[in-house]
Amino acid sequence: MASPEHPGSPGWRGPINQCRTRTRQEVLPPGPDLPCPGPEEAQDGPSSNSSMTTRELQEHWQKEKSRWKHVRLLFEIASARIEERKVSKFVMYQVVVIQTGSFDSDKAVVERRYSDFERLQKALLKRFGPELEDVTFPRKRLTGNLSAETICERRRELREYLRLLYAVRAVRRSREFLDFLTRPELREAFGCLRAGQYARALELLGRALPLQEKLTAHCPSAAVPALCAALVCLRDLERPAEAFAVGERALRCLRTRENHRYYAPLLDAMVRLAYALGKDFAALQSRLDENQLRRPTHRDATLKELTVREYLS
């Protein structure tokens, strides 16, 4: 007999059914740039009365220094191909992004047209004009755009352009730069999710997420909507173990963001997945209950209700 104490039972009275829907729908935190956590936010440093030796302290702070060292990304225009439409031909450039400092098994690959780069340049000039005076954008050519020589030269120029942009801190953390590299794939992925095309959505998320996580390493919560979308797809494709693993990644991104709009819906989904998988969900349920006690008058949307509202424009 189903018990009301168990997720998914008819009498289940989880906080998802007891709170009020919030309407804030920004994908990233408000403001032009993403917040940048730093060493001052670390909570696991040695206390003032620590018994660690001098050498141990040196090793600890060396690890802390490495932990907060800025992640460097390398950009390469790996290849180019000519796309032919009914009334036009244009070149698609394959952009590969690799993280330095360690073996990167999740190199990110996207394709963009010259016109996409051009729109990015215009948006960045509008916002960061003076800071881009040393950044050279490849000039537009009226003829010969499809010649092998021109394509090869432009590949080198676009690679250098991305390198110079990334060197400007304000630019690499800007919404414009992030959207240029991730928004087309994410928008299509969330559109597929809304249409119930979960396999296709997962494929697109698999391409976009590694890059989004690299670009927002200073703000892990920025990747939470996409991670939760992957959870929803995997769950609805009846792949609960994989869905649970993705959910754990999302929860790690929110470990200091308990007021985040995805926090309670994600916990609720994880409780239900844990129960379905036969896992101990007591700790997850406890976190969910504590969150509900802090916000007794709120009703959260379900995780799926949240994700289908993303990237509507």
Swiss-Prot record:
Major subcellular location class: membrane
Compartments where found: Early endosome membrane; Cell membrane; Cytoplasm; Nucleus
Comp. bias intervals (Polar residues): 45-55
Entry superkingdom: Eukaryota
Compositional bias ranges of the Pro residues kind: 29-38
Residues bound to a 1,2-diacyl-sn-glycero-3-phospho-(1D-myo-inositol-3-phosphate): 113, 115, 140, 154
Alphabetical GO biological process terms: protein transport
Residue ranges, annotated region (Disordered): 1-60
PTM sites of type Phosphoserine: 3
Domain (PX) ranges: 71-188
Consequences of knocking out this gene: No visible phenotype. Mice appear healthy and normal. Neutrophils from mutant mice display unchanged Selplg-mediated cell-cell adhesion and Selplg expression at the cell membrane is unchanged.
Ribonucleoprotein among keywords: no
One GO CC term on file: plasma membrane
Effect the entry attributes to changing residue 113 to Q: Abolishes location on endosome membranes. Abolishes binding to membranes enriched in phosphatidylinositol 3-phosphate. Mildly decreases binding to membranes enriched in phosphatidylinositol 4,5-bisphosphate
Complex and partners: Interacts with SELPLG. Interaction with SELPLG is controversial and was not detected in PubMed:25882846.
Name used for this protein in its record: Sorting nexin-20
